[in-house]
Protein backbone atom coordinates (compact mmCIF):
# COMPACT_ATOMS: atom_id res chain seq x y z
CA UNK A 1 0.00 0.00 0.00
CA UNK A 2 1.53 3.28 -1.12
CA UNK A 3 0.39 6.46 0.63
CA UNK A 4 0.49 9.36 -1.82
CA UNK A 5 -0.75 12.92 -2.05
CA UNK A 6 -1.92 12.27 -5.63
CA UNK A 7 -3.26 8.83 -6.51
CA UNK A 8 -3.28 7.83 -10.18
CA UNK A 9 -4.27 4.80 -12.18
CA UNK A 10 -1.13 2.86 -13.16
CA UNK A 11 -2.70 0.22 -15.43
CA UNK A 12 -6.04 -0.60 -17.07
CA UNK A 13 -7.17 -2.72 -14.09
CA UNK A 14 -6.74 0.10 -11.56
CA UNK A 15 -9.94 1.57 -10.15
CA UNK A 16 -10.20 4.70 -8.00
CA UNK A 17 -12.78 4.26 -5.24
CA UNK A 18 -13.77 6.56 -2.40
CA UNK A 19 -14.15 4.65 0.87
CA UNK A 20 -15.11 6.58 4.02
CA UNK A 21 -13.81 9.80 2.45
CA UNK A 22 -10.43 8.28 1.52
CA UNK A 23 -9.45 7.87 -2.13
CA UNK A 24 -8.07 4.40 -2.82
CA UNK A 25 -6.74 2.62 -5.90
CA UNK A 26 -7.91 -1.00 -6.13
CA UNK A 27 -6.16 -3.28 -8.62
CA UNK A 28 -5.54 -6.95 -9.33
CA UNK A 29 -1.82 -6.17 -9.06
CA UNK A 30 -1.08 -5.67 -5.33
CA UNK A 31 1.84 -3.34 -6.16
CA UNK A 32 -0.64 -0.80 -7.53
CA UNK A 33 -2.58 -0.39 -4.26
CA UNK A 34 -2.55 3.25 -3.16
CA UNK A 35 -4.39 5.53 -0.81
CA UNK A 36 -4.46 9.27 -0.35
CA UNK A 37 -3.03 10.39 2.96
From Swiss-Prot:
Recorded GO MF terms: structural constituent of ribosome
The keyword Plastid belongs to this UniProt entry's keyword annotation: yes
Keyword Ribosomal protein tagged: yes
Organism of this sequence: Cyanidioschyzon merolae (strain NIES-3377 / 10D) (Unicellular red alga)
Main location: plastid
One GO BP annotation of this record: translation
Pfam families xrefs: Ribosomal_L36 (PF00444)
Locations listed in the record: Plastid, Chloroplast
Gene: rpl36
Family: Belongs to the bacterial ribosomal protein bL36 family.
GO CC annotation, single: ribosome
Top-level taxon: Eukaryota
Keywords per UniProt: Chloroplast, Plastid, Ribonucleoprotein, Ribosomal protein
SUPFAM superfamilies membership: Ribosomal protein L36
Protein name stated in the entry: Large ribosomal subunit protein bL36c
Amino acid sequence: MKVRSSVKKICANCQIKRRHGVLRVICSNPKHKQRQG
